[in-house]
Each structure stands twice: as C-alpha cells, then as structure tokens.
C-alpha cells in the first residue's frame, strides 16, 4: 500500500518516520563537509525562491543533501532514481520535514516514471539528477517546462553519457553540470565508494566468502578499478574484462588478468558488471558459466546482464535470501544466482556508498546547484564541468574536517614554477 497526498507526497508508510530520522541523524553526524556548506547556506540563503527537483537514490545521505539545499532557501521535491534503492523510512522522515517526496521501494516502471512526473509537476527551476531520467523526461514529456529550467546537475557516468548524446543531437535545452566528472567525484566516489559498497551489497545479499573465489570485473573504469582492487584485498582472484586497450593495459600493470568474456565466463565464480553499457553478459556467456555462478551489477541501469535470457530459458525461478537473490535453474541443472534483479547492487542489496564518500559527492552537488542559481541563466545549453574552484574547495573542506594541513609553496618555488630560464 502507498499513502498518497497529491501535490504533497506519495510514500509507503508515514509511521516509519522515527526510524528514518535516526538514519538521517547518523548520516548527518558523519558529513562535515555538507555541514560546513549548510552553515553558510543558512546565513546567505543563496537558493531563496528556487525550487529544486531531485531524482536521486533516496536514502539517509541524500536526505542530508536535501536539508542543505533547504537551508539555502530552496523548496525541494524528490523521487528515487532506481525502483529498489529508496529507503521508505527516510522518505517518511523527509515528508515530516516539509519535503515533497514521491518514492517507495519496489516501484513498478510505470510508478517510477509517474513519480518523476510528480516531481516535475512542481516546475523545478533546477534539477538534480542521477542517471538523467528526469532530465530526459522533462525534454520529452514537459517541453514547455524544459524551456524554463535554469539548469541541472548529473551525478553519474551513465547520465553524463546520455547528456552528451542529447547535446550532440541538439536537443538539450539547458546547461547541465556534470558532477560525475569532477576530480573529487570520480577519484573518490567512483573508485573508493563503488569499490567498497558494491562488494558490501554482494556480501550482504549472499553471506559468501570472497577469499579464494574467482571474481570477474567487467569494465575497468573508475568503478571497475575500485571493485577489482577491493575484491583482491578480500582474497579473490580477479579477472578483468575490457574493450579499451589502455584500460586493459592498466589492469594488467595493476596485477590483474585480462581476457574476453567468452573465456572469463568459464572461469568466474562471481561476475560484477560496471560498464554503463548493455548486454555485457549475454546468453552465450551464461551458457558457459559454472553451476552456482553469482551475477551482480554495479552499473546504474539493469541492462548489463541479460535477464531476459534467464527468464526465458530457466526451468524454475526461486527467490532466495529474502528476495535479494533470484535463483534460476536451467535445463541442464545449472543454478545461476542473480543479485537484486540485476539492479544497482550497492543500493538494492546494501546501503550504498560510505557516508564520508557521499559527503564529498553531495557537497559538489550543493555547490553546483548554487552555481546554477547564480549563473545558470547566462549559461548556454550544454554539458559543463564543475568549476575548478568548487572542486578544489570541496577537497579543502574535506581535509579541514580531517584535521589535515597541507604544505605551502615558498615564494621562490612559485616563481620557479612560472619561469623558463633555469635549466641544467
């Protein structure tokens, strides 16, 4: 059952709010960077009169970002960016704080897009997106609103790729800041965050030991790098599957084996996809896999593993581990285990990235929203990098919160770095 008050909220259970408040408080206590930004926002109110529409994984860390934007004067409407990642307790708690929340765990595809439409019905000035579903939706279903949107931010690699495609085709109608492409995002969130949280979700769902297992990581971008290194740290034998020769060479130099999926399919005990592309594990690969193989996806959308093949070719389908694992029994007796329906494993089966990592990423989001509020009307449609001063400021705030001081260049060193006369 879902409790709906149109124009205000649509959530699973308002009585879950006390637990949600506790979850948010714990996250808030471990997010000092956003805390520092929130204090400034409370004083300066840079978002006064701005409505922010958000499509993010709706959980405790996201709630702290919502609070930060509201402290700056924004009105917020939010929904989830994945049908299985919403924490119903947090949704209930945010409603009590006056947030327009339209999300619950286990949405159908129709409900998922209906909730995005509900957010867009608030006519947001700025959109904060994860995966670009909301940005794409406002262009296709709300074209008049798209003309009035000041700008947007995008959290993920997958979303940024979609936005570049929109811009190439000439359909993107407002500026979007690619938060994903900031150094403090991809070096920390994509690598350390995904590396830890993807394996955490896998282990929560299965309770298996990784030591001694052969783990195949599909994709060696920043997310794949993090997963591969954390899996090795837990004692796994790691194989990397890549299409990019430079990334493949890096994986080799990092000490991993590299091979095509056809060969890796025969060796792997566990497969984790992290490509942002579709059909990277297909039926012909599944046919070669071992009995008891485990498949998990760390990419944004559930298109990396061929679920249709499993559904169409299995003789029996069984829910395991409280629904976190689906067992497919194939005609030859082989068992294939799919984690969280092939959706984002770290959030569908776990609690997402560590709090301290999202403190950094959401600080980038908050400051990027501020940039759009101040400068967005003068920016042309397109995909923009996070301003360097914002990227640097987030790193400075994080280091300050950790009590870390940096060395400083002397005047002579600064002058030397600008000169060309001195040589050997």
Swiss-Prot record:
UniProt similarity note: Belongs to the adenosylhomocysteinase family.
Pathway where this protein functions: Amino-acid biosynthesis; S-adenosyl-L-methionine biosynthesis
CDD domains (UniProt xref): SAHH (cd00401)
Full protein name: S-inosyl-L-homocysteine hydrolase
Purpose: Catalyzes the hydrolysis of S-inosyl-L-homocysteine (SIH) to L-homocysteine (Hcy) and inosine. Likely functions in a S-adenosyl-L-methionine (SAM) recycling pathway from S-adenosyl-L-homocysteine (SAH) produced from SAM-dependent methylation reactions. Can also catalyze the reverse reaction in vitro, i.e. the synthesis of SIH from Hcy and inosine.
A single GO cellular-component term on record: cytosol
InterPro entries: Adenosylhomocyst_ase-like_sf, Adenosylhomocysteinase-like, Ado_hCys_hydrolase_NAD-bd, NAD(P)-bd_dom_sf, S-Ado-L-homoCys_hydrolase_CS
Catalytic activity: S-inosyl-L-homocysteine + H2O = L-homocysteine + inosine
Cofactor field: NAD(+)
Source species of the chain: Methanopyrus kandleri (strain AV19 / DSM 6324 / JCM 9639 / NBRC 100938)
Extra facts: SAH is a product of SAM methyltransferases and is known to be a feedback inhibitor of these enzymes. As a result of this inhibition, organisms have evolved efficient enzymes to metabolize SAH via different pathways. The pathway found in methanogens differs from the canonical pathway, it uses the deamination of S-adenosyl-L-homocysteine to form S-inosyl-L-homocysteine for the regeneration of SAM from S-adenosyl-L-homocysteine.
EC number(s) stated in the UniProt entry for this protein: 3.13.1.9
